[in-house]
Design a protein with these regions (language model features):
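Flexible loop linkers connecting adjacent transmembrane helices
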Residues: 37-61, 84-86, 90-94, 98, ...
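Helix-loop-helix module between adjacent transmembrane segments
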Residues: 27, 31-32, 100-125, 131-195, ...
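Transmembrane helix-loop junctions in multi-pass membrane proteins
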Residues: 3-4, 34-39, 77-82, 158-169, ...
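Selective recognition of specific alpha-helical transmembrane segments in multi-pass small-molecule
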Residues: 103-111, 185-199, 210-230, 263, ...
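Alpha-helical membrane segments and immediately flanking helix-loop junctions
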Residues: 56-88, 114-132, 136-137, 150-153, ...
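Membrane-interface loop-to-helix entry segments
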Residues: 23-30, 34-47, 166-172, 179-240, ...
């Protein structure tokens, strides 16, 4: 087993090395300029996300689709991942993470656009879409579409299911002393109540859970920043200067280089917002929307909230806390966020614990739909119920077993998902540009599209 784990670890490191980072970041930059900087319409996207398009075709509201995508995206990576990036790459990693989110918005925009453009209406009236449908219907590459679906289904049992259940069980054990098997049963029952209801039930829960957990976490960050008010601006200066001159950080960050700051900041940003991975457009295709561009704008806001807001807030909290409290150092590594939140009297540690628990549970819900849509593409609706039950059972086993090998396999599957998705994005970028010109730059966002 150790040999297999080592092999997947090597494969994961290779797949998520500089070639993948350059490919993803290059796609972000290419689409930003190919689509004429759609980030300029951020406020329009935010407005559309909270404005129901009830008469349009689709299964869930645009906000429901966004909330479900955010449920799967906003996870422990926003908390632990940023801390790891700062510990390994220095304060400058925060700026690189933030910039990755800014440019990643264009990729998430293109993913949402193509998802709606090539979605299909099943016999039961439900909408299905995502990279697999764009690859098949837009590029006639069904073989690559099937590969994407297989990688997505496998990834759903890893990063979306067992890994999250394990995080919840271990945290509940460490914090409250609860047996992992008992926590596993509870998570299974709670998840079953939502997942067995399908996308409408998942979206309904996510529209309540996601805003609540995100606002609560951000408020916690704001409290810490108020406590560290004298160090906030110095932290901003340190983040900016050390991104290009790590020696400016001094102290324990002296070992960091510009390459390390960029490497860990960019990688964490890419992991965090999933722009380019191809997962979020699966639920974007289910949105009630009049045309592809409306949902594309809404989808792009997901990267803004996840990386530009939440990851940036986490980074600012960490760096300002290191400056404010001499007992907090980069050596705390992944525990940096926990140490920083512990400075809030009485409620700091419980608040962070609750945040991690809800982030992990919401990821379970979002990824269950991604995996179900993938197996539905391969085998049809007859396997949906079986997949849901298998996913719920896997949650229990995830809570009680060692998951080192699962982490490495999940990382590999996520990288392998990205490759077919990036092929679709780059080869169909001309279509995305045409649709953007037709609806967005011609001010025709209220026009209806023709759907098959």
């Amino acid at each position: 087993m150790d040999t297999i784990n080592d092999l997947f670890s090597l494969l994961s490191n290779f797949l998520w090395g500089w070639p993948m980072i350059i490919l993803l970041l290059g796609t972000h930059l290419f689409l930003t300029f190919r689509l004429r900087i759609p980030q300029r319409k951020l406020l329009t996207g935010i407005r559309l996300s909270v404005k129901p398009d009830a008469n349009a075709k689709g299964d869930v509201s645009q906000f429901g689709a966004l909330a479900t995508a955010l449920a799967a995206t906003i996870g422990t990576g926003n908390i632990v991942g940023v801390a790891t990036a700062v510990a390994l790459g220095g304060p400058g990693a925060v700026l690189w993470c933030w910039l990755t989110g800014i440019f990643g918005m264009s990729t998430k925009y293109a993913e949402g656009l193509l998802a709606v453009k090539y979605r299909v209406k099943a016999s039961d009236g439900r909408m299905y879409g995502g990279p697999m449908y764009a690859l098949e219907r837009g590029l006639n590459m069904r073989w690559l579409a099937i590969l994407f679906a297989v990688f997505t289904a496998l990834a759903s049992f890893g990063i979306g299911c067992t890994v999250q259940a394990n995080s919840i069980a271990l945290l509940a054990y460490e914090t409250f002393g609860l047996p992992t098997w008992l926590v596993g049963i509870f998570v299974c029952l709670l998840a079953a109540m939502v997942i067995l209801g399908g996308i409408k039930a998942i979206a309904r829960v996510c529209t309540i859970l996601v805003p609540f957990m995100a606002i609560l976490y951000v408020l916690g960050c704001v409290v810490i920043l108020i406590m560290n008010s004298d160090y906030v601006w110095p932290a901003v200066e340190l983040i900016v200067t050390s991104a290009f001159n790590p020696s400016a950080a001094g102290g324990g960050f002296m070992g960091a280089t510009v390459m390390m700051a960029a490497r860990y900041g960019i990688a964490r940003g890419l992991f965090s917002n999933e722009s380019g991975m191809g997962s979020a457009p699966i639920v974007a295709a289910a949105a009630q929307t009049r045309n592809p561009v409306r949902q594309a704008l809404v989808s792009s806001t997901g990267t803004f909230w996840d990386t530009v807001v939440i990851c940036a807030m986490t980074g600012l909290v960490l760096v300002s806390s290191i400056l404010a409290y001499p007992d907090i150092t980069f050596a705390d590594g992944a525990a940096l966020t926990k140490v920083a939140f512990s400075k809030i009297p009485y409620i700091g540690a419980p608040l962070l614990t609750f945040g991690i628990l809800t982030f992990a549970f919401s990821t379970i819900l979002g990824w269950s739909y991604y995996g179900e849509s993938a197996v539905n593409y391969i085998e049809g609706r007859r396997i949906n119920r079986f997949y849901r039950i298998l996913y719920i059972v896997a949650l229990f086993f995830g809570s009680i077993i060692n998951l080192d090998i699962i982490w490495n396999i999940a990382d590999c599957m996520n990288a392998l998902m990205a490759i077919p998705n990036l092929v679709a994005l780059l080869l169909l970028s001309g279509i995305a540009a045409e649709e953007t010109k037709k609806y967005l730059w011609a001010n025709r966002l209220d026009d209806e599209m023709e759907e098959d």
